[in-house]
Amino acid sequence: MKIAIIGHGNVGGALAKNWAKSGHNIIIGTRKAQDEKAAQLVAEHELIKTAPIQEVVATADTVLVATPPQVATALARSWGTLPGKVIIDATNAIWQQPEGYDTAYHAFADITKAEVVKAFNTTGFENMENPQYGDTTADMFIAGDSETAKEMARKLANEAGFERVYDFGGGDKVKALEHFAFAWINLAIMQGEGRNMAFKVLKK
């Protein structure tokens, strides 16, 4: 599968490396020819390449967005309509929001008409690199109205090492999933528990 990564910071970079190890072709969208972070990722794995953002979005099967949320509306408008393409929104509009929307998910869904899912936003990038904790793994959580996009997110989460993926619900639950992400940020960073922590659902 060809996966476009838009936003190759900590989260995007971690998932790019993880999915490349699973055999996917990763194309990192860049705005400039000389991009040190992108070049470092390319050097780490032969299945990671770079190309201009518009090109990678047009040619990829799935697009992961891990940018600051406030640029989502402009990105979506620049891409136009993308019927049938899967977009995974890994942003969190907690302190800043996209122009005209509460979340990046809603901007992408409304403007591009793509198959959109919220995922990979509720834990730190360290867990994107390795979600293993002893003999168990961190859980992943998804939300959105597209079953096609959810199925893709489940598949990619499993391949990244997340054994269990829980469905938070439809597009009306996306903001709740961002609040859930803030719970991780609060515990890990603000309350000093450390970034090597994750959420796990326990059942009796």
Residues covered by each model-derived region:
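Short beta-strand and adjoining strand-loop segment in the mid-core
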Residues: Q96-Q97, H106, N130-E151, K155
